[in-house]
Amino acid sequence: MKVLQEKILSEGKVLSGDVLKVDAFLNHQIDPVLMQEIGKEFAKRFQEEKITKIVTIESSGIAPAVMAALELGVKVIFARKRKSLTLQENMYVANVYSFTKQETNEISLSKKHIHEDDRVLIIDDFLANGQAALGLMSLVEQAGASVSGIGIVIEKAFQDGGKKLRERGVRVESLAEIASLEDGTVTFVQHETAEVR
């Protein structure tokens, strides 16, 4: 997605060979116009999947998930990382290791919001080692629902998360795929495009 790549190049900051900071538009301050475009792109890519629900994880996945849900006309449910006094029982639970925070979180979804007939699109801001997506898949599978696809805003293609998910037969659509963050420079994966005649 060209507009996203341009935003990453202009406002993203490479902190190391593994870490890209995009708090200027995605995971602290949110650019609503960009999020709207991201939502439209996810909806376009998954329009044939008959999605009934979008599942994400708090907090940075919520904005792109809501925008995609608006386009698809479905609801969003986000996995919580912290226990809530209002959500104590009847929860699906999974453990997820956070690459960025270097810690394991217990994530949960309420059983009353996801059902076995749901066709779920998982959306998240980043894909690195795949732990968040695998944890969300576990929650969906515990409900007996089906994962119709995974939408990722930014994939670190140099890490193995995308490979793990695709090897499981899951359709993964990433809007920006980063090949490298070496030497403080963002390099995107180059896809061959067929010549139109």
Swiss-Prot record:
Enzyme Commission code(s) on record: 2.4.2.22
Residues annotated to bind xanthine: L20, N27, K156
Binding site for 5-phospho-alpha-D-ribose 1-diphosphate: A128, N129, G130, Q131, A132
Keywords carried by this UniProt record: Cytoplasm, Glycosyltransferase, Purine salvage, Transferase
Superkingdom field: Bacteria
Localization annotation: Cytoplasm
GO biological process, one term: xanthine metabolic process
CDD domains: PRTases_typeI
Coiled coil: none
InterPro entries according to UniProt: PRibTrfase_dom (IPR000836), PRTase-like (IPR029057), Pur/Pyrimidine_PRTase (IPR050118), Xanthine_PRibTrfase (IPR010079)
Pfam families: Pribosyltran (PF00156)
Reaction catalyzed: XMP + diphosphate = xanthine + 5-phospho-alpha-D-ribose 1-diphosphate
One term of GO molecular function: xanthine phosphoribosyltransferase activity
Pathway: Purine metabolism; XMP biosynthesis via salvage pathway; XMP from xanthine: step 1/1
Principal location: cytoplasm
Self-association and partners: Homodimer.
Function as written in the Swiss-Prot or TrEMBL entry: Converts the preformed base xanthine, a product of nucleic acid breakdown, to xanthosine 5'-monophosphate (XMP), so it can be reused for RNA or DNA synthesis.
Family from the record: Belongs to the purine/pyrimidine phosphoribosyltransferase family. Xpt subfamily.
HAMAP family: XPRTase (MF_01184)
Protein name: Xanthine phosphoribosyltransferase
